[in-house]
């Protein structure tokens, strides 16, 4: 596997004669100069070099301006070859006759820039994001698409005027001209002339003598001469140093065997690397400058790489050391007595010196592989303008929508998209629920192409909502299938899927990933203790072996933020259902992408299969299969506790469309169906970038979620104290390994600020509640005589009664909703659909001691619909001890509000999903500890029973009413008189679950005010 590098290019002397040139297909001779483009491998989570002869490299259109910055391995070349690379780069990639050793004439055309007439009207200008019409002249620059780096260098098209505006940014140098564009000769005479005027070669004319003013130019010249002299001296020193190192290498190659060199490294307490050239480099470095002492931070081995010495050790089992220095500590290099017989080593005397480094280039380092330092979910179409969120997308409409086709087309085009009639070309499908349920031929094509289906309301929300496009797609999704929606990159259509591995038939780069069969969501076939991976092709004829109570199936994860890896490895031992036949199946790749592969290997016997399984497991994790206590080792995988249990069928039975057997009132039936909606649970996880392929709903263990909480607790200290990057890296790597995330080709973001920690705390809170809901669905009786709705209702252990709309209590509650809607929460109005009176089993008894406490109020608590199965069955809970206290404004407690809209905001509804649930609970507040700013409370002051966060607005206290000793603050909002507070509205927090008695559950419709029409 290739070594990870942020640089797109690599140069070195060929280590063997086995590699062939990607341009001419001829072999590259050993020790000859070769150059490579680093390309994402389609087979594993890493990059591989595509090697070229030196001259061929420039012919395929590579434009390098600063080889010392852009090319990995440049400084390790011989001095003459460094100059050769520099001069060729300066000449715009023209190697010149005879320069490549083959004597071939180099091409003068710029291979990475092209001009042509658009072959269709499908491409989009990367400058203005407008369509390029068929037959219109267009210019391109070959670049790596950060979302699909496995495609390598692809054309990115521009209108000529847009290209001219971005000339410098695109690397079209001043000395380049239009006539050097590939395809220029095929343009019409008129277009050639126009393009020559737009893209002329710009000559840098020197100043005339008469330009000098008051001697200032003379001062500048003297300064320039000084800098030139200084640079010239440094160049000479670097050249002498380079020649010294290469002289040592050349002599060592003649005088010593590879084993001799290894012995020299071991004697000087240096690690022995793999590969002859690496061993030679390390010995030469030690002889020239001294033996390197271990890293002070981790005791690892320091190694020279281009611009510094980097530590190759590990701070912890999860994270590599980040130490980098140009002045490492050294000791004298010692040659053992037995080696002094070698004449060269006997004569060699090197004066102790420090390694000289070239000055840091002022050229910006272009990072070609996508980086991410934010924890917020990335917009699906991040390149799109704010007013055109559907730019580069093709939309298919199916079924009878509220608008006719022309109206829908107008709206879609207004948002930057295009209407299409083909499922294979579509990025997204807009339809209605009935069409998905009906599953006609056209919808089957949509499913086959793995295109996500969303409701028509999505078009309204996408222009009005502040949520990311991914969140809106999740909220409006109608289909259980669907790859992540991506904008179309010009003419290369390659939406990213979420399959564990590509089809065995797929070879090389993916031309059209969207139609890859393996991209469809995996259907896991459960047999006995685990699910057989469908990529094995044996899901219907074999099962996972279970022996001694242990299931021979393992899902492993490895995250390294520095390298940008987010890898999985799956291992299964499969046994034939009928015969004594055994297979080892393994799959590997990058989470959330089609990058990866798999292997099915038939074994001669059960014993050999078990032995091979255990060998592979130990190779990947460093742990024996039967070891009870797992130890994480550096660069090794970590097992995920994913439960592929036998309860899936029970879930399916209880989520089927309810029949007519239910004796519950219709509103209660609808409420229970809403609470246990599995699709809503999946949508919630997708919003948090959870990878549902590697962590199917309900499959991650509670223990692993709690371990993730503990990591976030550890993160809060280094984040608040500004600790070392290594510590934050370590904790981030551990977190993302425990909770598999889908980041596509982006690097996993560091958990390096309070907001990112807060977002992940919220994610784990929801994961826990979803885990409760799913556990309820899986557990309990399998009584086929009962309606599924009734079975699920019983699991809530809550008496739910519909409140008569005309009753006095319903009137009071509606008034409370109307009066306490805050003026700043003006994006929607709230409409009460149903009011339910609830009584949780055992809660009244638990609350009994607090009934005598003064200051009891009826307050609001809002949450996602997916959390209500957990809330009703287990009550409102305080975050677990493992959760970080900084994830909550006033510490870990249960939060309430007296303004309905403050709590309603936590329902996370949208125009496409406007129904939310909110609760009213009787809360025993007693003596309140009043605060104006965040305070991470872990223990209340003596004599206090709760915290009140003071807001600038409060319900009018004169309008409050009292029902059975409980205050209902249903007055309209008025200024509270508290101005120096961080809160707009009041918050109430209790730290004992027994202080809460849930009374009512409201089903609300959020009537959003913003619309496209």
UniProtKB/Swiss-Prot annotation:
<dbReference type="GO" id="GO:0034599">
    <property type="term" value="P:cellular response to oxidative stress"/>
</dbReference>
<dbReference type="GO" id="GO:0000723">
    <property type="term" value="P:telomere maintenance"/>
</dbReference>
<dbReference type="GO" id="GO:0032991">
    <property type="term" value="C:protein-containing complex"/>
</dbReference>
<feature type="domain" description="PARP catalytic">
    <location>
        <begin position="787"/>
        <end position="1013"/>
    </location>
</feature>
<feature type="binding site">
    <location>
        <position position="162"/>
    </location>
    <ligand>
        <name>Zn(2+) 2</name>
    </ligand>
</feature>
<dbReference type="GO" id="GO:0036211">
    <property type="term" value="P:protein modification process"/>
</dbReference>
<keyword id="KW-0227">DNA damage</keyword>
<comment type="similarity">
    <text>Belongs to the ARTD/PARP family.</text>
</comment>
<feature type="modified residue" description="PolyADP-ribosyl glutamic acid">
    <location>
        <position position="448"/>
    </location>
</feature>
<dbReference type="GO" id="GO:0016779">
    <property type="term" value="F:nucleotidyltransferase activity"/>
</dbReference>
<dbReference type="GO" id="GO:0005737">
    <property type="term" value="C:cytoplasm"/>
</dbReference>
<feature type="modified residue" description="Phosphoserine">
    <location>
        <position position="179"/>
    </location>
</feature>
<dbReference type="GO" id="GO:0070213">
    <property type="term" value="P:protein auto-ADP-ribosylation"/>
</dbReference>
<dbReference type="GO" id="GO:0140805">
    <property type="term" value="F:NAD+-protein-serine ADP-ribosyltransferase activity"/>
</dbReference>
<keyword id="KW-0597">Phosphoprotein</keyword>
<comment type="subunit">
    <text>Homodimer; PARP-type zinc-fingers from separate PARP1 molecules form a dimer module that specifically recognizes DNA strand breaks. Heterodimer; heterodimerizes with PARP2. Interacts (via the PARP catalytic domain) with HPF1. Interacts with NMNAT1. Interacts with nucleosomes; with a preference for nucleosomes containing H2A.X. Interacts with APTX. Component of a base excision repair (BER) complex, containing at least XRCC1, PARP1, PARP2, POLB and LRIG3. Interacts with SRY. The SWAP complex consists of NPM1, NCL, PARP1 and SWAP70. Interacts with TIAM2.</text>
</comment>
<dbReference type="GO" id="GO:0032042">
    <property type="term" value="P:mitochondrial DNA metabolic process"/>
</dbReference>
<dbReference type="GO" id="GO:0006259">
    <property type="term" value="P:DNA metabolic process"/>
</dbReference>
<feature type="cross-link" description="Glycyl lysine isopeptide (Lys-Gly) (interchain with G-Cter in SUMO2)">
    <location>
        <position position="527"/>
    </location>
</feature>
<comment type="function">
    <text>Poly-ADP-ribosyltransferase that mediates poly-ADP-ribosylation of proteins and plays a key role in DNA repair. Mediates glutamate, aspartate, serine, histidine or tyrosine ADP-ribosylation of proteins: the ADP-D-ribosyl group of NAD(+) is transferred to the acceptor carboxyl group of target residues and further ADP-ribosyl groups are transferred to the 2'-position of the terminal adenosine moiety, building up a polymer with an average chain length of 20-30 units. Serine ADP-ribosylation of proteins constitutes the primary form of ADP-ribosylation of proteins in response to DNA damage.</text>
</comment>
<feature type="zinc finger region" description="PARP-type 2">
    <location>
        <begin position="113"/>
        <end position="203"/>
    </location>
</feature>
<feature type="binding site">
    <location>
        <position position="24"/>
    </location>
    <ligand>
        <name>Zn(2+) 1</name>
    </ligand>
</feature>
<dbReference type="InterPro" id="IPR012982">
    <property type="entry name" value="PARP1-like_PADR1_Zn_ribbon"/>
</dbReference>
<feature type="binding site">
    <location>
        <position position="295"/>
    </location>
    <ligand>
        <name>Zn(2+) 3</name>
    </ligand>
</feature>
<dbReference type="InterPro" id="IPR036616">
    <property type="entry name" value="Poly(ADP-ribose)pol_reg_dom_sf"/>
</dbReference>
<dbReference type="GO" id="GO:0043596">
    <property type="term" value="C:nuclear replication fork"/>
</dbReference>
<feature type="modified residue" description="Phosphoserine">
    <location>
        <position position="185"/>
    </location>
</feature>
<keyword id="KW-0862">Zinc</keyword>
<dbReference type="GO" id="GO:0048148">
    <property type="term" value="P:behavioral response to cocaine"/>
</dbReference>
<keyword id="KW-0805">Transcription regulation</keyword>
<feature type="modified residue" description="Phosphoserine">
    <location>
        <position position="177"/>
    </location>
</feature>
<dbReference type="GO" id="GO:0006284">
    <property type="term" value="P:base-excision repair"/>
</dbReference>
<feature type="modified residue" description="PolyADP-ribosyl aspartic acid">
    <location>
        <position position="387"/>
    </location>
</feature>
<dbReference type="InterPro" id="IPR004102">
    <property type="entry name" value="Poly(ADP-ribose)pol_reg_dom"/>
</dbReference>
<keyword id="KW-0021">Allosteric enzyme</keyword>
<dbReference type="GO" id="GO:0045892">
    <property type="term" value="P:negative regulation of DNA-templated transcription"/>
</dbReference>
<keyword id="KW-0539">Nucleus</keyword>
<feature type="region of interest" description="Disordered">
    <location>
        <begin position="200"/>
        <end position="226"/>
    </location>
</feature>
<dbReference type="GO" id="GO:0040009">
    <property type="term" value="P:regulation of growth rate"/>
</dbReference>
<feature type="modified residue" description="Phosphoserine">
    <location>
        <position position="781"/>
    </location>
</feature>
<keyword id="KW-0328">Glycosyltransferase</keyword>
<feature type="short sequence motif" description="Nuclear localization signal">
    <location>
        <begin position="221"/>
        <end position="226"/>
    </location>
</feature>
């Amino acid at each position: 596997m290739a070594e990870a590098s942020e640089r797109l290019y690599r140069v070195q002397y060929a280590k063997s004669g086995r590699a062939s040139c990607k341009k001419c297909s001829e072999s590259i001779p050993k020790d000859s100069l070769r150059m490579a483009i680093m390309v994402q491998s389609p087979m594993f989570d890493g990059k591989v070099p595509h090697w070229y002869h030196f001259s061929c490299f420039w012919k395929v259109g590579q434009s390098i301006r600063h080889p010392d910055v852009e090319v990995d391995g440049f400084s390790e070349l011989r001095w003459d070859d460094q100059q050769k690379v520099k001069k060729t780069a300066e000449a715009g990639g023209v190697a010149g006759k005879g320069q490549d050793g083959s004597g071939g004439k180099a091409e003068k055309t710029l291979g990475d820039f092209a001009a042509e007439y658009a072959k269709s009207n499908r491409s989009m200008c990367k400058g203005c994001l407008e369509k390029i019409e068929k037959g219109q002249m267009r210019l391109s620059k070959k670049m790596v698409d950060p979302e699909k780096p496995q495609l390598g260098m692809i054309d990115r098209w521009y209108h000529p005027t847009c290209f001219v505006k971005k000339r410098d940014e695109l690397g079209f140098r001043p000395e380049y001209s239009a006539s050097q564009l590939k395809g220029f000769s095929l343009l019409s005479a008129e277009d050639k002339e126009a393009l020559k005027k737009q893209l002329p070669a710009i000559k840098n004319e020197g100043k005339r003598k008469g330009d000098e003013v008051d001697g200032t130019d003379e001062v500048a010249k003297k300064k320039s001469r000084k800098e030139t002299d200084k640079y010239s001296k440094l160049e000479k020193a670097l050249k002498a140093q380079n020649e010294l190192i290469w002289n040592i290498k050349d002599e060592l190659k003649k005088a010593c065997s590879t084993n001799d060199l290894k012995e020299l490294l071991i004697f000087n307490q240096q690690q022995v690397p793999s590969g002859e050239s690496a061993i030679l480099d390390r010995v030469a470095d030690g002889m020239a400058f001294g033996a390197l002492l271990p890293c002070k931070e981790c005791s690892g081995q320091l190694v020279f790489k281009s611009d510094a010495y980097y530590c190759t050790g590990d701070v912890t089992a999860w994270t590599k050391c980040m130490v980098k220095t140009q002045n490492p500590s050294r000791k004298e290099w010692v040659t053992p007595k037995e080696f002094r017989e070698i004449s060269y080593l006997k004569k060699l005397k090197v004066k102790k010196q420090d390694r000289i480094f070239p000055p840091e280039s002022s050229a910006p380092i272009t990072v070609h592989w996508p980086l991410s330092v934010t924890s917020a979910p990335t917009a699906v179409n991040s390149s799109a303008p704010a007013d055109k969120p559907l730019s580069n997308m093709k939309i298919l409409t199916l079924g009878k929508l509220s608008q006719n086709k022309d109206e829908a087309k107008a709206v879609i085009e207004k948002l930057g998209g295009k209407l299409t009639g083909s499922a294979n070309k579509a990025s997204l499908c807009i339809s209605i629920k009935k069409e998905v349920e009906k599953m006609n031929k056209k919808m089957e094509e949509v499913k086959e192409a793995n295109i996500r289906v969303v409701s028509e309301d999505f078009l309204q929300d996408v222009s009005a909502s502040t949520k990311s496009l991914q969140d809106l797609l999740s909220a409006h999704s109608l289909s259980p299938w669907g790859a992540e929606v991506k904008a179309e990159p010009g003419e290369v259509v390659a939406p990213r899927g979420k399959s564990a591995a590509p089809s065995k038939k797929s070879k090389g780069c993916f031309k059209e990933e969207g139609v890859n069969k393996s991209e469809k969501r995996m259907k896991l076939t459960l047999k006995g203790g685990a699910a057989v991976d469908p990529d094995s092709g044996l899901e219907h004829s074999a099962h996972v072996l279970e022996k001694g109570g242990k299931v021979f199936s393992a899902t492993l994860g490895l995250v390294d933020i520095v390298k940008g890896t987010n890898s999985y490895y799956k291992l299964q031992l499969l046994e034939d259902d009928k015969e004594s036949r055994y297979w080892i199946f393994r799959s590997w790749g990058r989470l959330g992408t089609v990058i990866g592969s798999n292997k099915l290997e038939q074994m001669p016997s059960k014993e050999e299969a078990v032995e091979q399984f255990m060998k592979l497991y130990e190779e990947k994790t460093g742990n024996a299969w039967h070891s009870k206590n797992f130890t994480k080792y550096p660069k090794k995988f970590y097992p995920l506790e994913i439960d592929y249990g036998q309860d899936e069928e029970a879930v399916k039975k209880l989520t089927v469309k309810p029949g007519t057997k239910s004796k519950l009132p219709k509103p209660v039936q609808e409420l229970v169906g809403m609470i246990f909606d599995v699709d809503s649970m999946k949508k919630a996880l997708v919003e948090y970038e959870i990878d549902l392929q590697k962590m199917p709903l309900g499959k991650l263990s509670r223990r692993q979620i709690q371990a993730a909480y503990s990591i976030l607790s550890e993160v809060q200290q280094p984040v608040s104290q500004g600790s070392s990057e290594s510590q934050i890296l370590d904790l981030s790597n551990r977190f993302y390994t425990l909770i598999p995330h889908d980041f596509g080709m982006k690097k996993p973001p560091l958990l390096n600020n309070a907001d990112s920690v807060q977002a992940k705390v919220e994610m784990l809170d929801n994961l826990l509640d979803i885990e409760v809901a799913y556990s309820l669905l899986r557990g309990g009786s399998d009584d086929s005589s009962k309606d599924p709705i009734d079975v699920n209702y019983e699991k809530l252990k809550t008496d739910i009664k519909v409140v008569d709309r005309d009753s006095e209590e319903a009137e009071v509650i509606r008034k409370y909703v109307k009066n306490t809607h805050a003026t700043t929460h003006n994006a929607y109005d709230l409409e009460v659909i149903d009011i339910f009176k609830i009584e949780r089993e055992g809660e009244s008894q638990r609350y009994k001691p607090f009934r005598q406490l003064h200051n009891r109020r009826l307050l609001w608590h809002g949450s996602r619909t997916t959390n209500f199965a957990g809330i009703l069955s287990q009550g409102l809970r305080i975050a677990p001890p493992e959760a970080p206290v900084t994830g909550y404004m006033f510490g870990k407690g249960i939060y309430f509000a007296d303004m309905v809209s403050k709590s309603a905001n936590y329902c996370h509804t949208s125009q496409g999903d406007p129904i939310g649930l909110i609760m009213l609970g009787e809360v025993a507040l007693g003596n309140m500890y009043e605060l104006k700013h965040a305070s991470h409370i872990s223990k209340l002051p003596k004599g206090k029973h709760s915290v009140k966060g003071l807001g600038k607005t409060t319900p009018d206290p004169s309008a409050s009413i009292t029902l059975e000793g409980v205050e209902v603050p249903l007055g309209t909002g008025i200024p509270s008189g508290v101005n120096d507070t961080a809160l707009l509205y009041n918050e109430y927090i209790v730290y004992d679950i027994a202080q809460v008695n849930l009374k009512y559950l409201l089903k609300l419709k959020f009537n959003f005010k913003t619309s496209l029409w």
